[in-house]
């Protein structure tokens, strides 16, 4: 059964289609605010253990039980034999169609409708139709079938709830999406329809903390201004719940947080009383307001101007820090640099970042800004200046002409790739805006039993291609998404992944060319100056560089440090291209492997899939088992609130943050999961690699990644050029990654000898 709780962190949950059928219940809800709030989420409540006053007909009992269990053969036998008449199918006004609908028995529903049963029959004290019963539990396929067979979506139960109200109360966002596109978009139901208490679907979604439904309702133009009989707007009820994403959606849409209820309470007062002030103030900050609800002061009218400043700040900061270490004692330079760094960080957060246009659900951070890409650019520019004005003049005629020439070529290529990657299209899948096309997509997914958020994108209204991921930076699904790279301030995907590989390879090679030339330069300094000795560096060329050109020494040291994490990044990327997997996919497979045998008393159906058993296939069951969404469990269909997620997530330390930025966390995962260092056994490692559906063998994987699908082009062009459109190789076959819904099958040759990876 479903439940609702106003405490932050709780979420509604719905039974899976494989739950035991509901029977021996009585629909009886008291007419008060609490009962009304709960009744739509608990449509069928056993309030009494008293048996019916008159004995149940054994034939009707057998028939209803068959409808509940989905026993189509028994239903057909009873109706075909004539022992049961659909017109007398009553047990307390509850028909077999009601029982089949609320238990997600699609085949029984279709058969009963084909036999002429009344699809709008009312049942129970609430006088609810089968459509209402199915909607309360979020069963999209049943709702679709009933609507196609004449069920009236405008009918209300005794509580005044219509199809849209009940869809929202089910907390199944896929049903909400279906009703919005197939009913609301056609003008059959008003998006702002109110129940007898004046509560709109948006108000109910806000009260439940259902951020996905709130997002969809707002996309369809739901009003944030309408108040219920108590003077509460959706934002007031969202403040009661305290779900930060819901608050952010509503405030960004223009909800008035100063508006007072009939009791004279605004959102600030409600947040304080309900202990949700932290979530409310965070939402205000994300939407550009201070803690008092007034717009933050912005230094820049355009977000792009603030981003340009953020990009160039690291260049200035690095220059100052290197100058400090060049002319001051290292301890004093370190102290001043720390103070200076904290001041820069504070200035950026307080003065620059508020000018960003934030369309996401989280506050803008330096990690999600051009700051790190500016750090790379500043480092590269300082290295270039040192090479041009200090190193090249001394080494170009000292048997290092060819090395300097290659250094020039590498630097030019790095600059070119860096700029190209920043402005590149990672492979954004076009957004769908035509409602008719969206309805066609939904119908297709319903027919295949794949109408869930794993296959349908709620943000862009498209069928999600395999290997794609929605990017908040680009606000599109990115085909063959790998990861977001803060060093180029862009996503890495199908269209720019190969350029990214060339970029990091050339960066690593360029650093070592620079180190080689720097050592030659220091050797010249040692020969042309007095001999000196250093405490840790000895008396060779390193000491000469430190004493006679400390700025160049520091730049070389900084470059050497960067080469370490770039090298690890190359290892990760090469490993993943060998195994035919992206960064995001590998992390997902590792997580699934860890959770495969974990027991959790609460299983969340985070894909919102309510496909009836009749439409499921073996692949669906296998996938559900791998992801923890086993249909044999009573899964909820509401994603836990952000508050509950944060409470169960380990806090990220500074050490872990540095690991994530430099990619060392990926190296650690690869070493542990594939080399067996850290606990993974041989069988576990082989299971992980074999579970990757895009791993077709290392030779095939490399060819798929490095060669374009244009087989008529020269081999050099296929190697160095990235995919221009959405087509690329997968298992040697050209596929359209914008419409990739099935993987090419793996072929397993007959073993004739020792198998190779």
Swiss-Prot record:
An example Gene Ontology CC term for this record: Golgi membrane
Pfam families found in the cross-reference section: Ank_2, Ank_4, DHHC
Polar residues: compositionally biased ranges: 1-20, 36-46, 624-646
GO molecular function: G-protein beta/gamma-subunit complex binding; protein-cysteine S-palmitoyltransferase activity
Residues of the active site: 485
Lumenal-side segments: 329-331, 397-402, 520-550
Membrane topology listed for this record: Multi-pass membrane protein
InterPro entries associated with the record: Ankyrin_rpt (IPR002110), Ankyrin_rpt-contain_sf (IPR036770), Palmitoyltrfase_DHHC (IPR001594)
Topological domain spans for side Cytoplasmic: 1-307, 353-375, 424-498, 572-757
Subcellular compartments: Early endosome membrane; Golgi apparatus membrane
Domain of life of the organism encoding this protein: Eukaryota
Segments forming domain DHHC: 455-505
Keyword Lipoprotein set for record: yes
GO biological process: negative regulation of pheromone-dependent signal transduction involved in conjugation with cellular fusion; protein targeting to membrane; regulation of endocytosis
EC number: 2.3.1.225
Chain positions covered by the region annotation Disordered: 1-54, 614-647
Catalytic activity: L-cysteinyl-[protein] + hexadecanoyl-CoA = S-hexadecanoyl-L-cysteinyl-[protein] + CoA
Keyword annotations of the record: Acyltransferase, ANK repeat, Endosome, Golgi apparatus, Lipoprotein, Membrane, Palmitate, Repeat, Transferase, Transmembrane, Transmembrane helix
Keyword GTP-binding tagged: no
Major subcellular location class: membrane
Membrane-spanning intervals of the chain: 308-328, 332-352, 376-396, 403-423, 499-519, 551-571
Main function: Palmitoyltransferase specific for casein kinase 1.
Domain notes per entry: The DHHC domain is required for palmitoyltransferase activity.
Similarity field: Belongs to the DHHC palmitoyltransferase family. AKR/ZDHHC17 subfamily.
Listed name of the protein: Palmitoyltransferase AKR1
Organism for this UniProt entry: Naumovozyma castellii
Higher taxonomy: Eukaryota, Fungi, Dikarya, Ascomycota, Saccharomycotina
Gene giving rise to this polypeptide: AKR1
């Amino acid at each position: 059964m479903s439940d609702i709780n106003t405490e932050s962190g709780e979420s509604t949950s719905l039974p899976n289609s494989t739950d035991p059928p509901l029977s021996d219940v009585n629909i009886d809800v008291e007419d008060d605010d609490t009962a009304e709030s709960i009744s739509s989420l608990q449509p069928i409540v056993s309030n009494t253990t008293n048996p019916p006053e008159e004995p149940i007909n054994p034939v009707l009992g057998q028939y209803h039980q068959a409808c509940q269990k989905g026993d189509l053969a028994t239903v057909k036998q009873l109706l075909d034999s004539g022992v049961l008449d659909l017109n007398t199918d009553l047990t307390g006004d509850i028909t077999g169609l009601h029982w089949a609908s609320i238990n997600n028995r699609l085949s029984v529903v279709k058969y009963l409708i084909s036999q002429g049963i009344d699809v709008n029959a009312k049942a129970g004290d609430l006088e609810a139709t089968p459509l209402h019963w199915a909607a309360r539990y979020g069963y999209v396929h049943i709702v679709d079938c009933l609507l196609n067979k004449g069920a009236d979506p405008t009918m209300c139960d005794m509580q005044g709830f219509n199809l849209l109200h009940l869809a929202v109360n089910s907390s199944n966002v896929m049903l909400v999406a279906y009703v919005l596109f197939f009913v609301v978009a056609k003008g059959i139901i008003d998006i702002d329809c109110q129940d007898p208490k004046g509560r709109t679907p948006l108000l109910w979604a806000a009260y439940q903390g259902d951020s996905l439904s709130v997002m969809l309702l707002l996309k369809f133009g739901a009003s944030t201004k309408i108040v219920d009989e108590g003077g509460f707007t959706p934002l007031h009820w969202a403040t009661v719940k305290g779900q930060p994403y819901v608050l952010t959606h509503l405030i960004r849409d223009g909800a008035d947080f100063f508006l007072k209820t009939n009791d004279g309470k605004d959102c600030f007062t409600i947040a304080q009383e309900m202990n949700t002030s932290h979530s409310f103030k965070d939402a205000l900050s994300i939407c550009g307001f201070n803690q008092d609800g007034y717009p933050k002061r912005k230094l820049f009218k355009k977000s792009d101007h603030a981003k340009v400043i953020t990009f160039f700040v690291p260049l200035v900061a690095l220059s100052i820090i290197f100058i400090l270490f060049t002319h001051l004692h290292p301890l004093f330079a370190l102290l001043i640099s720390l103070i200076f760094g904290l001041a820069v960080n504070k200035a950026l957060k307080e003065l620059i970042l508020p000018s960003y246009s934030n369309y996401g659900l989280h506050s803008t951070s330096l990690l999600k800004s051009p700051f790190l890409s500016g750090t790379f650019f500043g480092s590269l520019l300082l290295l270039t200046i040192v090479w041009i004005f200090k190193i090249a003049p001394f080494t170009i005629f000292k048997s290092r002409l060819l090395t300097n020439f290659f250094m020039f070529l590498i630097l030019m290529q790095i600059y070119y790739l860096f700029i190209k990657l920043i402005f590149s299209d990672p492979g954004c899948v076009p957004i769908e805006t035509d409602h008719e096309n969206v309805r066609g997509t939904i119908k297709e997914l319903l027919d295949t039993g794949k109408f869930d958020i794993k296959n349908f994108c709620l943000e862009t209204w498209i069928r999600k291609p395999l290997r794609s991921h929605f990017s908040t930076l680009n606000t599109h699904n990115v085909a063959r998404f790998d990861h977001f790279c803060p060093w180029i301030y862009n996503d890495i995907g199908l269209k720019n992944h190969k350029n990214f590989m060339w970029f990091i390879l050339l960066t690593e090679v360029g650093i070592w060319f620079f180190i080689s030339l720097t050592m030659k330069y220091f050797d010249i300094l040692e020969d042309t100056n007095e001999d000196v000795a250093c405490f840790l560096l000895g008396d060779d060329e390193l000491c000469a560089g430190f004493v006679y050109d400390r700025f160049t020494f520091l730049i070389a040291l900084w470059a050497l440090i960067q080469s370490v994490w770039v090298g690890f990044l190359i290892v990760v990327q090469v490993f993943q291209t060998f195994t035919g997997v992206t960064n995001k996919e590998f992390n997902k497979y590792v997580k699934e492997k860890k959770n495969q045998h974990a027991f959790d008393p609460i299983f969340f159906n985070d894909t919102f899939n309510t496909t009836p058993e009749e439409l499921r296939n073996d692949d669906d069951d296998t996938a559900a088992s791998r992801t923890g969404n086993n249909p044999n469990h009573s899964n909820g269909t509401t994603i836990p609130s952000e508050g509950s997620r944060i409470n169960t997530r380990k806090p990220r330390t500074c050490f872990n943050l540095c690991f994530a930025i430099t990619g060392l966390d990926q190296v650690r995962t690869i070493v542990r999961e594939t080399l067996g260092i850290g606990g993974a056994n041989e069988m576990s490692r082989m299971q992980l690699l074999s579970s990757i559906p895009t791993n077709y063998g290392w030779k095939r994987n490399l060819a798929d990644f490095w060669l374009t699908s244009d087989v008529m082009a020269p081999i050099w062009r296929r190697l160095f050029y990235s995919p221009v459109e959405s087509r690329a190789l997968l298992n040697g076959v050209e596929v359209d990654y914008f419409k990739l819904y099935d993987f090419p099958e793996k072929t397993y040759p007959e073993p004739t000898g020792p198998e190779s990876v």
